Amino acid sequence: MTQAPVTVTVTGAAGQIGYALLFRIASGQLIGPDTPVRLRLLEIPQAVKAAEGTAMELDDCAFPLLQGIEVTDDARTAFDGTNVALLVGARPRTKGMERGDLLEANGGIFKPQGEAINAGAADDVRVLVVGNPANTNALIAQAHAPDVPAERFTAMTRLDHNRALTQLAQKLGVSVNDIKKLTIWGNHSATQYPDLFHAEVNGKVAAEQVDQAWLADTFIPTVAKRGAAIIEARGASSAASAANAAIDHIHTWVNGTPEGDWTSAAVVSDGSYGVPEGLISSFPVVARDGRYEIVQGLEIDEFSRQRIDASVNELSEERDAVRKLGLL
């Protein structure tokens, strides 16, 4: 175990996702079983005590890879020298809240965090935004970190990807391991588009193994509205599954995608597939040499085009709204 430790910052660390995430990071699941980790837990002042309680529990696990924990309410301290930043803490939408108010409230969180990452994060920093609206929160943070390469800012659609894998596997009576090349396009919202036209199940096109009515009327809405269904059933939003997807996203980013497969992540668009340059949108991606790259050359049929465009239009509207608020 001669590897240098990786510093991982988790915001909203005292929340449910943070609680589900931190023990898995400390056990070595984020990067790998040979990489020591140092944890930084960032919280708002009134939640610092709760985060300190979580830190006590982490200590009590005696994880061999865990080389230290720091709890703070100061963003500059939290992101100083950090290699991986998991931005989980966000302002949730409350009843009757307009989208503009939600974007403004989150701007107040993600602008200073972007500035703090810009000021002090390690040169190899990787940022994953989990807190919703994740794509646009990532855009705000990235806009305020001009010295960090834009490609280092990502938002999480791996939870949607994993949800889609399981829905398809259950429909066809196969293992999730039998499914390759599934894609989530667009926004992490109800407009997202889970694409089966390029996905393969045991080497055959997935969309050809299900009927069109199931795909359009059951599969797509089930994946898109799964978060709401979990709130309805559990009385609280997805926490362990979101934490699991965050682990998957970073682990893949660092260690690579399997040969002959890809995954989904919201990354800064380079104009591929008609997505305006600079938007943070979900694409099919491969991870190579520690970088996410958009899979090129896929043919997009009319069914898919309409759905991708609808989600991308929503992202453009969100970007315009935060621009008007002076957050970009």
From Swiss-Prot:
UniProt xrefs under PROSITE patterns: MDH
GO BP annotations, alphabetical order: malate metabolic process; tricarboxylic acid cycle
E.C. code: 1.1.1.37
Residues where substrate binds: R93, R99, N132, R163
CDD domains for the chain: MDH_chloroplast-like (cd01338)
Record's catalysed reaction(s): (S)-malate + NAD(+) = oxaloacetate + NADH + H(+)
Stated family: Belongs to the LDH/MDH superfamily. MDH type 2 family.
UniProt name for this protein: Malate dehydrogenase
Organism (species): Saccharopolyspora erythraea (strain ATCC 11635 / DSM 40517 / JCM 4748 / NBRC 13426 / NCIMB 8594 / NRRL 2338)
Lineage: Bacteria, Bacillati, Actinomycetota, Actinomycetes, Pseudonocardiales
